[in-house]
């Protein structure tokens, strides 16, 4: 094998590894975005129910607290994007 073939094979392997890393990061960010949307939706729903009935819905509050406990990040901080 010539040196050019070896360099080409190494370049393909490096490109494959980089592609896997990039798509993994994209997937993690996508999941985080979906979780944030669900949390925002639950917060809006709790606010609407609180306005309608004068108190918060216990089921929604429990679901929101469960979601927040799953991820230790501060979801309301949008400055890091």
UniProtKB/Swiss-Prot annotation:
The gene is vpu. Residues 29-81 are cytoplasmic. One of its GO terms (biological process) is symbiont-mediated-mediated suppression of host tetherin activity. Enhances virion budding by targeting host CD4 and Tetherin/BST2 to proteasome degradation. Degradation of CD4 prevents any unwanted premature interactions between viral Env and its host receptor CD4 in the endoplasmic reticulum. Degradation of antiretroviral protein Tetherin/BST2 is important for virion budding, as BST2 tethers new viral particles to the host cell membrane. Mechanistically, Vpu bridges either CD4 or BST2 to BTRC, a substrate recognition subunit of the Skp1/Cullin/F-box protein E3 ubiquitin ligase, induces their ubiquitination and subsequent proteasomal degradation. The N-terminus and transmembrane domains are required for self-oligomerization and proper virion budding, whereas the cytoplasmic domain is required for CD4 degradation. The cytoplasmic domain is composed of 2 amphipathic alpha helix that form a U-shape. HIV-1 lineages are divided in three main groups, M (for Major), O (for Outlier), and N (for New, or Non-M, Non-O). The vast majority of strains found worldwide belong to the group M. Group O seems to be endemic to and largely confined to Cameroon and neighboring countries in West Central Africa, where these viruses represent a small minority of HIV-1 strains. The group N is represented by a limited number of isolates from Cameroonian persons. The group M is further subdivided in 9 clades or subtypes (A to D, F to H, J and K). This is Protein Vpu. It is a single-pass type I membrane protein. It is found in: Host membrane. HAMAP family: HIV_VPU. One of its GO terms (cellular component) is membrane. Homopentamer. Interacts with host CD4 and BRTC; these interactions induce proteasomal degradation of CD4. Interacts with host BST2; this interaction leads to the degradation of host BST2. Interacts with host FBXW11. Interacts with host AP1M1; this interaction plays a role in the mistrafficking and subsequent degradation of host BST2. Interacts with host RANBP2; this interaction allows Vpu to down-regulate host BLM sumoylation. The chain crosses the membrane at residues 8-28.
């Amino acid at each position: 094998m010539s040196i050019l073939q070896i360099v080409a094979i190494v370049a393909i392997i490096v490109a494959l590894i980089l592609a896997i890393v990039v798509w993994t990061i994209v997937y993690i960010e996508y999941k985080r975005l979906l979780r944030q949307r669900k949390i925002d939706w639950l917060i809006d729903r709790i606010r609407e129910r609180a306005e309608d009935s004068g108190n918060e819905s216990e089921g929604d509050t429990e679901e929101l607290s469960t979601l927040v406990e799953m991820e230790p990040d501060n979801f309301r901080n949008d400055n890091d994007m």
